[in-house]
């Protein structure tokens, strides 16, 4: 019997399509029942069309159930994935503009500080509603996978107060993993005196680099980095400072790496708003 996976907030093109690709890459899930729901009919229809096209192009038999009725989508679901942005971009704009009026310059404002708190106040009541629906209509052992921000707040609320088994997920680890592979490639060839274009140049891909990460959403760290049987964690600072692109684009991440010894999964700007000293004054923000 095939399992059912429901997406709430499926009108989020980037996240929904990326997650569908991940799901369909797992052989055991290629016969899953997929249900999409969203309150925005236009976005829901657009994303459904694109994802169905991806499915058909790969010769799979899945037909996406697309509905504006959340209860229909989650009925009998084994997994429910939350991708919602409560309040939409209009509310997100206020999360940035209101704090800025009082001198709080956030980069994204979706996790902590004033913006994160306002975002959480909108999201927590809604995710608790989702939990109530899941308990009533989904399978009894349904797992809620939360991709929405503020991730830690929403996941905590669903797990502790919603009474539904919940995990929080984010794509940040993969992005930094690619950067780390590039840095190791630079170091490996530099150690051997090999230049790009030489016939014995060594290319390093993500699949070649094994990582262990620890932390919470938007505060996660690569605490162990293994390539070719060796631990490269302590050489990350050297590599990032040498990299011709990353040393310019990842100044905050490199500074944090220098201070604390671990590279962060978060983007440069995102990381800058989680500590106290990068965004205190406009001229300092420009520096980083």
Where are these regions (language model features)?
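Metallocofactor- and cofactor-centric catalytic cores in central/energy metabolism, strongly enriched
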Residues: 2-96, 108-112, 116-188, 204-211, ...
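Generic detector of intrinsically disordered, low-complexity, polar/charged segments
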Residues: 6-8, 56, 100, 258, ...
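Glycine-/small-residue-rich beta-strand-loop submotif within the FAD-binding core of flavoenzymes
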Residues: 101-109
């Amino acid at each position: 019997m095939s399992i059912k996976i429901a997406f709430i907030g499926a009108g989020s093109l980037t996240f929904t399509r990326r997650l569908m690709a991940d799901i369909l890459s797992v052989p055991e899930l290629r016969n899953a029942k997929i249900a999409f729901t969203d309150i925005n009919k236009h976005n829901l229809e657009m994303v459904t069309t694109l994802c169905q096209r991806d499915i058909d192009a790969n010769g799979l038999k899945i037909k996406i159930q697309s509905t504006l009725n959340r209860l229909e989508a989650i009925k009998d679901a084994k997994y429910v994935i939350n991708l919602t942005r409560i309040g939409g971009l209009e509310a997100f704009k206020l999360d940035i503009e209101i704090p800025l009026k009082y001198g709080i310059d956030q980069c994204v404002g979706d996790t902590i500080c004033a913006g994160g708190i306002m975002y959480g106040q909108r999201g927590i009541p809604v995710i608790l509603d989702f939990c109530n629906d899941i308990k009533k209509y989904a399978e009894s052992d349904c797992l809620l996978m939360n991709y929405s921000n503020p991730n830690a707040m929403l996941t905590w609320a669903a797990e502790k107060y919603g009474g539904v088994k919940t995990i929080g997920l984010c794509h940040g680890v993969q992005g930094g993993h690619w950067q780390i592979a590039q840095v190791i490639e630079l170091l490996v060839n530099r150690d051997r005196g090999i230049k790009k274009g030489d016939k014995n140049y060594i290319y390093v891909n993500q699949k070649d680099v094994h990582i262990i990460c620890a932390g919470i959403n938007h505060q996660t760290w690569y605490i162990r980095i293994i390539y070719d049987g060796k631990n490269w964690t302590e050489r990350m600072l050297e590599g990032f400072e040498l990299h011709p692109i990353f040393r310019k684009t990842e100044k905050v991440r490199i500074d944090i790496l220098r201070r604390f010894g671990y590279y962060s999964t978060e983007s440069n700007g995102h990381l800058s708003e989680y500590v106290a000293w990068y965004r205190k004054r406009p001229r300092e923000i420009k520096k980083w």
